[in-house]
């Protein structure tokens, strides 16, 4: 069962409302939540414009580029208005695609200042598109699957603390919208066990994020023909509404035990590249260091 999301940051562009997802701004009426307990793949419904016409989602690159978008938050921002999207990442391409990607991802300390939304994740894509850096994909069939940490935690939960992160599993497209699993609390200092595994030749995948401390997890299943080959792997820092360098953690983000497989075997000769298409006007001290084929560290301060 799918329900429309109401928790994530929204903004208005050219008369349409957009939601900040971990792959850019998507029309809000096309961003859905699926219950983590429902592991049968729930297909995304058709995405249509406000006038009821089928649309290809051309995402707003930022929430306030070109003066077309009014910010929901009037707080002064010391960073440039287009300082969002993928701000740090590492990439690896295997033309034959992947059958799984697994890793551990640390849960950093909470930023001292609150961004609109900060996303941290590993992910698998079908094309090499970098939100807010490379031109938007104007053809259909772009996708990404990803277990995602987000700050702040946004769901209503009496147990959530001010410094807690949220954790979900995501599937995002630019022509059919996005689908996310139920948000769970991810406390700072924990570790996320990330798992994206292909379960069928028809493009079926399980996207799973579990907490090492408790075993709590948030999972979704997806089946789409566009997912048959996912040849691009990433680890990423993505932000929307970052209001200065204090909207980053103090501690590093650690991606460890990275593993990629194809046809039942480990992918050989993995060579990650740090920021091959970098943020053009970096303002903070973000940096990505490739420690090895299995370990990548992102620092913020």
Q: What residues fall within each predicted segment?
A:
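Exposed, interaction-prone regions of secreted/extracellular proteins
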Residues: 1-301
């Amino acid at each position: 069962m799918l329900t429309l999301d109401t928790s994530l940051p929204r903004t208005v562009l050219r008369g349409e409302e957009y939601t900040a997802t971990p792959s850019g701004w998507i029309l809000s009426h096309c961003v859905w939540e699926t219950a983590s307990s429902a592991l049968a793949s729930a297909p995304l419904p058709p995405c249509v414009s406000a006038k009821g016409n089928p649309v290809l989602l051309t995402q707003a690159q930022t929430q306030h580029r070109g003066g077309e978008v009014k910010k929901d938050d009037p707080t002064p921002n010391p960073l440039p208005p287009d300082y969002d999207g993928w701000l740090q990442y590492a990439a690896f391409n295997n033309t034959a695609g992947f059958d799984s990607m697994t890793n551990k991802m640390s849960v950093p300390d909470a930023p001292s200042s609150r961004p609109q939304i900060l996303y941290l994740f590993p992910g698998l894509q079908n094309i090499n598109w970098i939100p807010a850096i490379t031109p938007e994909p104007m053809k259909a069939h772009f996708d990404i699957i990803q277990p995602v940490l987000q700050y702040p935690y946004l769901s209503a939960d009496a147990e959530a603390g001010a410094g807690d992160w949220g954790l979900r599993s995501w599937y995002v497209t630019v022509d059919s919208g996005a689908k996310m699993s139920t948000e769970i609390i991810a406390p700072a200092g924990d570790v996320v066990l990330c798992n994206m595994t292909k379960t069928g030749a028809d493009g079926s995948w399980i996207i799973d994020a579990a907490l090492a401390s408790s075993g709590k997890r948030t999972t979704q299943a997806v089946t789409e023909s566009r997912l048959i080959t996912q040849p691009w792997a990433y680890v990423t820092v993505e932000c929307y509404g970052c209001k200065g360098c204090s909207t980053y953690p103090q501690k590093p983000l650690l991606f460890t035990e990275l593993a990629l497989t194809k046809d039942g075997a480990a992918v050989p000769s993995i060579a990650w590249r740090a920021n091959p298409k970098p943020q053009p006007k970096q303002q903070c001290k973000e940096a990505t260091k490739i420690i090895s084929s299995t370990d990548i560290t992102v620092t913020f301060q």
